[in-house]
């Protein structure tokens, strides 16, 4: 896979935007307003989570991201998802990632809290580089890229094919 970019959504708080800037990778932002975005290249999706916490997962995936992914062309180019969240919200921490991963049948590659740490930046850069330059079979590629959740209140997650 030669061409790969980051596609991300960030609200007006710009937390996800600041994280993506630290990556130093080619990126396109999903607009906050209703302007459409269509991509024609493979991408990793980075998305924040908006959920109330506890067992309330309603609204976890931002509406702008749903609109973006409702475009079949955009869906077909997604190669994986990375999500952010706030551990104060317990079980809904970074929940947008697993939701999108399951719906699109793409791997959940990483989850990070708020603005992310220097370690999160390095992990995402490494995931991006490995996916961009990987030439082995697709399933092996997916299995090698999947990482465990690092937050202590979560059990390790593995992507499973159905």
UniProtKB/Swiss-Prot annotation:
Record SUPFAM superfamilies: Flavoproteins
Family annotation (InterPro entries): Flavoprotein-like_sf, RNR_Ib_NrdI_bac, RNR_NrdI
One Pfam family of this chain: Flavodoxin_NdrI
Membrane-spanning parts: none
Molecular-function annotations in GO: FMN binding
Single Gene Ontology BP annotation: protein modification process
Top-level lineage group: Bacteria
Disulfide bonds: none
PANTHER family xrefs: PROTEIN NRDI (PTHR37297:SF1)
Known function: Probably involved in ribonucleotide reductase function.
Record-stated family: Belongs to the NrdI family.
Protein's name according to its UniProt entry: Protein NrdI
Organism: Streptococcus pyogenes serotype M28 (strain MGAS6180)
């Amino acid at each position: 896979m030669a061409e790969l970019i980051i596609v991300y959504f960030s609200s007006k708080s710009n937390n996800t935007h600041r994280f993506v800037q630290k990556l130093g990778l080619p990126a396109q932002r999903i607009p906050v307003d209703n302007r459409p975005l269509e991509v024609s290249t493979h991408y990793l999706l980075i998305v924040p989570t908006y959920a109330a916490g506890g067992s309330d997962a309603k609204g976890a995936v931002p509406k702008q991201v749903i609109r973006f992914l409702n475009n079949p062309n955009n869906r077909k180019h997604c190669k994986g998802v990375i999500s952010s969240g706030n551990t104060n919200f317990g079980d809904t921490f970074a929940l947008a990632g697993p939701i999108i991963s399951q719906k699109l049948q793409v791997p959940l590659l990483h989850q990070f809290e708020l603005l992310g740490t220097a370690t999160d930046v390095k992990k995402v850069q490494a995931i991006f580089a490995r996916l961009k330059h990987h030439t082995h079979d697709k399933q092996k590629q997916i299995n090698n890229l999947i990482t465990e959740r690092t937050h202590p209140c979560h059990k390790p997650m593995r992507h499973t094919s159905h």
